[in-house]
């Protein structure tokens, strides 16, 4: 459904959760299926966690998933990765803000400016990952 047709928080939750789970899974598969640029991106990294979290009703990890990258290998997962701190954390402040950024109602940089999302950690690698997310989204449209 388009974002403006979502009637309640349950529908918003479902769309955001599915979107983030698909994004992290797609990023991992993009590496495993052999994209040369993504493989190089993963190969040159030690063990790193790219964490995605959506805050709702005061709960900072209401929705959470991650991409783990280590020496050319990648794995996606649900929840907060607890064995180490994230190398990059994409923190969305609300379901509505996450919907706007993930639904491309606003670009990621604009979402940061408007307070929908913040990135904590390496800005350079956050940009790299955002570029790969844009490539994957382009494949779907």
For each of these PLM feature ranges, what is it?
Residues 1-141:
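Feature captures hydrophobic
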């Amino acid at each position: 459904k388009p974002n403006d047709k979502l009637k309640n928080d349950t529908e918003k939750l479902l769309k955001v959760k599915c979107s983030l789970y698909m994004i992290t899974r797609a990023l991992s598969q993009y590496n495993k299926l052999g994209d040369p640029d993504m493989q190089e991106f993963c190969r040159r990294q030690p063990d790193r966690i790219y964490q995605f979290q959506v805050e709702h009703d005061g709960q900072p990890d209401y929705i959470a998933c991650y991409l783990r990258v280590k020496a050319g290998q990648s794995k996606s997962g649900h929840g907060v990765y607890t064995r180490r701190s994230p190398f990059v954390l994409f923190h969305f402040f609300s379901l509505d803000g996450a919907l706007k950024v993930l639904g491309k109602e606003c670009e990621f940089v604009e979402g940061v400016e408007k307070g929908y999302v913040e990135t904590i950690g390496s800005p350079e690698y956050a940009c790299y990952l955002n570029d790969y997310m844009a490539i994957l989204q382009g494949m779907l449209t």
